[in-house]
């Protein structure tokens, strides 16, 4: 406990950390209890121990050098035995060099000084000219607004020093600094004490003004942020961190767009050639549509378009003719023309050509990957605002058609109301826990697709939309136009590659792309179900799980392998590349059952074998073979301490209100992510996250580590971690009982109906609690833990009329008194 308290303190220090000392136990013996405990604590606090060589004459590693895991300023680490001591010297260098400031050029427009009324008036006049088609109308709209932007806010290029930004600086501070310098010169020329005191007063005044200005500026930016992405950007600005993703250094800025464009295009072309050359047979025929077809899209009113625009995030893309701020200010005048473009597109079944171009930015997949290897980058598409608006209108009508005809797969949780990664994982974990509780072994298999969105075959997709999902007429023509003649260009540092034609795939940055992918892969559910294997989808993430007695583990592996081979054959036939190398498999059971299994087990496929892993990462949650979730908890704590330290480094510039918003968005959101999976875990596991929450509360309120934590949590009105878990589980129970949760969760909860007259018969919302065998396994399943906690709530609380009313009452009920 003392080491945890020490690390709690040092891990949140905003400065570079070097912690040296003789910890008096052997780091070179990883199986020792002390070593395991301190290594886990270091990992949880986002710290690393750098000394790996022996530091003692007896060959043990006793002396440690601890730094933050994200820091890399220690170089040339060495252990030397030249000193006359039984301990060796730990030698290292510090990289504290500073980079030279460079000059940079930027093209800017003075949007603030644009006369909105004059701009809108000219736009209304020029856009009134009739156009024969949706493409002509969209092109005229785009060129007109771009012309007006050049007229009212011409682009200018400026070169200036690349110095740290100081948006908080204002003329009053500049005037105070001049007075301070004047007072300093006077004091240094006279040497009088009274002049020194005057200078010190001016110095204090300037310091206080700068501090207040920084605090007010940071507070306003943070409180006005509307998304986590905006908060991240604000924090990076305050910390002086670079927002740009690392890029290869082996090419010039002018060469990079063409290099990336060629790489991305060649990669997809090679995948398609490989898939086309691989023989395959359809495993099952697609189901036929029976219902009310969608033959045409319904035109929308200006009010409907305005409502959709206000529900969207208005962000500027380089393909937009005017920036988002000008769009927002001029929207009442532009809305009739925008509505006309959308309705002509819907009625004619055509998508304007100008909407079919995407700008692609290469993004490094993980921060620790080599940026000089192009395989470590993924293409991220950016589309114009109007194209996404048109897709949003179509998606609204498409979703209505799909829900009316009940066409969505019940175990597909992506892009659906009331569904999330947490509900998907809760369903999977419920099945695995119940299987383990019954004494069985489960096999969880996670499938990985290579460039899943980019290899979709357009003809197969259109055929499936028509025959399986009942889309005909001009609606089908619209989707045909949407997929035909699409282009993309790569944009890197204001340099753009030539457009490349896309013969397959759907754009990932689009509104419709992910939904079209789920419809494209919908028949895969029938392939897996044909083998009687449980499954769940989340976009392109597919998981299969089956269970059997430990003695039948080989049969379990064989069944899954047969299913996997059929899935792979179906995917190949549908031009999707299943990646064997990244597919993972894990056996799940009690510690005793897992220990009794042979150590050489693997999933044997046609051409390869997949080794059995001890843990897998599924939708952001690390699952282990005993479902203890210790690695997930440790990873969550590590991420939280990283962000707490970043917030700590700018805490002096933040108000309590702004700090609270940052901590809520960046730290508590991680503690709460999928925390319903942690229900009924031992207190020793939960206390790791509770310690994170305690440190977050102290950081917000600027309290010492010795201050009692309960009053601080009460002051912030925060539920402790255990109660936050109960809050999430009970909220999902309420939604399940009231049909506001996925069917796969509602179906595992059942109203209790006693076989004879009992007092509980008077409770219409009492849930049946299934019986379990193992006290540490079965009660953790949602179908057990949910009813157990639900039945303990007052009936008046369970009968609340809405989720918001229930959650408000639930927080009061769970809050420590």
Model-inferred region functions:
Residues 114-148, 607-677:
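Basic, alpha-helical interaction scaffolds
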Residues 49, 62, 99, 141-144, ...:
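Basic/polar low-complexity segments
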Residues 13, 17, 70-162, 241, ...:
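Surface polyanion/phosphate-binding segment centered on an Asp-His-Pro turn
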Residues 54-71, 77, 295, 562, ...:
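Short, conserved micro-motifs composed of acidic
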Residues 25-36, 451-469, 543-568, 680:
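Catalytic palm subdomain of template-directed nucleic-acid polymerases
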Residues 264, 291, 295-507, 546, ...:
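Conserved pre-catalytic core of RNA-dependent polymerases
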Residues 6-17, 394-412, 435-437, 514-545:
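Active-site palm subdomain of RNA-directed nucleic acid polymerases
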């Amino acid at each position: 406990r003392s080491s945890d308290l020490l690390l709690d303190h040092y891990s949140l220090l905003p400065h570079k950390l070097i912690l040296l000392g003789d910890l008096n136990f052997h780091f070179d013996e990883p199986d020792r209890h002390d070593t395991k405990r301190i290594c886990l604590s270091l990992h949880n606090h986002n710290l690393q121990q750098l000394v790996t060589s022996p530091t003692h004459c007896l060959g043990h590693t006793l002396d440690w050098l601890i730094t933050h895991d994200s820091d890399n300023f220690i170089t040339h680490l060495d252990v030397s035995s030249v000193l006359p001591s039984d301990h060796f010297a730990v030698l290292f260098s510090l990289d504290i060099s500073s980079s030279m400031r460079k000059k940079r050029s930027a093209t800017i427009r003075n949007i603030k000084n644009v006369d909105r009324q004059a701009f809108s008036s000219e736009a209304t006049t020029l856009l009134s000219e009739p156009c024969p088609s949706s493409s002509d109308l969209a092109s005229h709209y785009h060129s007109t607004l771009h012309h007006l932007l050049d007229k009212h806010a011409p682009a200018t290029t400026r070169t200036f020093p690349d110095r740290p930004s100081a948006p908080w600086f204002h003329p009053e501070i500049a005037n105070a600094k001049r007075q301070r310098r004047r007072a300093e010169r006077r004091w240094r020329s006279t040497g009088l004490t009274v002049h020194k005191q005057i200078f010190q007063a001016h110095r204090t005044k300037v310091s206080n003004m700068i501090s207040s200005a920084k605090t007010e500026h940071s507070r306003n930016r943070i409180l006005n942020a509307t998304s986590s992405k905006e908060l991240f950007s604000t924090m990076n600005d305050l910390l002086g961190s670079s927002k740009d993703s690392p890029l290869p250094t082996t090419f010039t800025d002018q060469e990079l767009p063409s290099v990336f464009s060629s790489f991305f295009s060649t990669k997809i072309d090679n995948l398609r050639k490989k898939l086309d050359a691989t023989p395959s047979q359809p495993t099952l025929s697609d189901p036929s549509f029976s219902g009310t077809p969608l033959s045409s899209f319904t035109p929308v009113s200006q009010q409907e378009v305005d409502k959709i625009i206000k529900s969207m995030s208005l962000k500027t893309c380089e393909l937009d003719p005017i920036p988002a701020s000008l769009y927002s200010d001029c929207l009442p005048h532009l809305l009739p023309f925008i509505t006309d473009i959308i309705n002509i597109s819907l009625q004619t079944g055509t998508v304007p050509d100008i909407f079919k171009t995407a700008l692609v930015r290469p993004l490094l997949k993980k921060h620790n990957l080599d940026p000089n290897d192009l395989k470590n980058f993924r293409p991220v598409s950016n589309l114009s605002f109007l194209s996404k608006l048109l897709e949003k209108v179509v998606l609204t009508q498409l979703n209505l058609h799909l829900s009316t005809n009940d066409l969505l797969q019940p175990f597909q949780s992506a892009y659906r109301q009331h569904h999330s990664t947490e509900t998907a994982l809760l369903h999977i974990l419920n099945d695995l826990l119940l299987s383990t509780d019954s004494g069985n072994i489960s096999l969880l298999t996670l499938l990985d697709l290579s460039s899943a969105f980019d290899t979709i075959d357009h003809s197969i997709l259109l055929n499936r939309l028509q025959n399986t999902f009942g889309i005909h007429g001009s609606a089908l023509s619209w989707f045909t136009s949407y997929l035909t003649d699409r282009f993309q260009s790569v944009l890197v540092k204001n340099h753009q590659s030539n457009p490349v034609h896309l013969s397959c795939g759907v754009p990932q940055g689009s509104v419709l792309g992910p939904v079209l992918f789920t419809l494209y892969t919908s028949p895969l559910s029938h392939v897996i179900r044909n083998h009687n294997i449980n499954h769940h989808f989340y976009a392109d993430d597919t998981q299969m799980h089956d269970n059997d007695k430990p003695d039948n583990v080989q049969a379990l592996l064989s069944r899954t392998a047969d299913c996997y081979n059929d899935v792979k054959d179906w995917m190949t036939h549908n031009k999707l590349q299943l990646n064997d190398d990244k597919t993972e498999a894990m056996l799940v059971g009690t510690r005793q059952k897992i220990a009794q299994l042979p150590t050489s087990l693997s999933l044997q496929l046609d051409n390869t074998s997949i080794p059995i892993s001890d843990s897998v990462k599924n939708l952001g949650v690390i699952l282990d073979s005993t479902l203890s979730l210790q690695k997930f908890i440790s990873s969550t704590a590590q991420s939280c301490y990283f962000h707490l330290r970043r917030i700590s480094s700018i805490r002096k510039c933040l108000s309590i209100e702004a700090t609270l918003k940052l901590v809520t968005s960046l730290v508590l959101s991680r503690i709460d992510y999928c925390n319903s999976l942690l229900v009924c875990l031992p207190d020793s596991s939960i206390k790791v996250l509770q310690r994170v929450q305690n440190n977050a509360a102290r950081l917000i309120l600027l309290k010492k580590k010795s201050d009692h934590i309960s009053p601080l949590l009460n002051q912030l009105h925060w539920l402790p971690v255990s109660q936050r878990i109960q809050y999430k589980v009970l909220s999902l129970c309420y939604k399940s009982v009231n049909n506001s949760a996925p069917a796969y969760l509602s179906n595992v909860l059942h109203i209790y109906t006693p076989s004879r007259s009992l007092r509980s018969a008077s409770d219409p919302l009492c849930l049946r609690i299934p019986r379990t065998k193992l006290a540490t396994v079965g009660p953790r399943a949602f179908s057990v833990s949910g009813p157990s906690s639900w039945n303990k709530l007052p009936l008046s609380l369970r009968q609340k009329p809405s989720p918001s009313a229930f959650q408000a009452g639930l927080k009061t009920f769970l809050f420590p008194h």
